[in-house]
Amino acid sequence: MSAKIIDGKQVAQTIRNQVAAQVQQRLAQGKRAPGLAVILVGVDPASQVYVGSKRRACEEVGFISRSYDLSATASQEELLALIDRLNDDADVDGILVQLPLPAHCDTTQVLERIRPDKDVDGFHPYNVGRLAQRIPALRPCTPKGIMTLIETTGVKTHGLHAVVVGASNIVGRPMTLELLLAGCTTTTCHRFTQDLEQQVRRADLLVVAVGKPNFIPGEWVKPGALVIDVGINRLADGSLVGDVEFETARNHASFITPVPGGVGPMTVASLMENTLSACQDYHDQAL
């Protein structure tokens, strides 16, 4: 059996088209376009690529995009002051601080400074807590995008045994919460997990987010499993691979995301959805 490939690019394009149509509808009603402020500290090449893709997506859907590029030596006080100004700006619906930050910045303090109703990345403890309480508001973008991809397969998640490999605050932990909300029996594996192979082999739904190339051997994948590969790793020859050994895994799985072109585009598409939601759900009423 060969798995069906879940085309994240296509699904993400559909979402962007839907968001763009809603923006045009807003403008036709005399309402303003949603606004997203993107803050980049320093000149990390990978971060610049990610920020560029987010800015292009804003242009495509018709958002007002604002860019704030601070030097790597900018103080935490400068960054917090900028966030405070954007929190008070009625034309800004979403504030995104590109991670990672320079070592002298306290990431937790910076993310907590963003107003929860403008936290379109979904990283604020308030929004993660809402998800844990089963009343999600602005949901973390990558897990949100993954749930959208799973929905497109038609696979019913209730009762599935889901395994998440990786426990980061950005993907692994909120992904576990999303899968619990979707009715899965969910196991989270991390650096201290003793029996990783056995856990992976039991997974009806496998999500891997560790940032290590081909970390999960394809033969570990349970026959018929749905595999979501969040990792994107560049090898010495310049090629991109995920955290799962793709060619072997696709012969076991029923559905699998490719790398690139799987989860990555969905993260940005979910950011567009969150920004529109923040505008409509929280800020329109303030006008």
Swiss-Prot record:
NADP(+) binds at G166, A167, S168, I232. Its EC number is 1.5.1.5, 3.5.4.9. Pfam families: THF_DHG_CYH, THF_DHG_CYH_C. Pathway: One-carbon metabolism; tetrahydrofolate interconversion. GO terms for cellular component: cytosol. Disulfide bonds: none annotated. Keywords: Amino-acid biosynthesis, Histidine biosynthesis, Hydrolase, Methionine biosynthesis, Multifunctional enzyme, NADP, One-carbon metabolism, Oxidoreductase, Purine biosynthesis. InterPro entries: Aminoacid_DH-like_N_sf, NAD(P)-bd_dom_sf, THF_DH/CycHdrlase, THF_DH/CycHdrlase_cat_dom, THF_DH/CycHdrlase_CS, THF_DH/CycHdrlase_NAD-bd_dom. One of its GO terms (molecular function) is methenyltetrahydrofolate cyclohydrolase activity. SUPFAM superfamilies: Aminoacid dehydrogenase-like, N-terminal domain, NAD(P)-binding Rossmann-fold domains. It catalyses: (6R)-5,10-methylene-5,6,7,8-tetrahydrofolate + NADP(+) = (6R)-5,10-methenyltetrahydrofolate + NADPH; (6R)-5,10-methenyltetrahydrofolate + H2O = (6R)-10-formyltetrahydrofolate + H(+). Belongs to the tetrahydrofolate dehydrogenase/cyclohydrolase family. Catalyzes the oxidation of 5,10-methylenetetrahydrofolate to 5,10-methenyltetrahydrofolate and then the hydrolysis of 5,10-methenyltetrahydrofolate to 10-formyltetrahydrofolate. Homodimer. This is Bifunctional protein FolD. It comes from Aeromonas salmonicida (strain A449). The gene is folD.
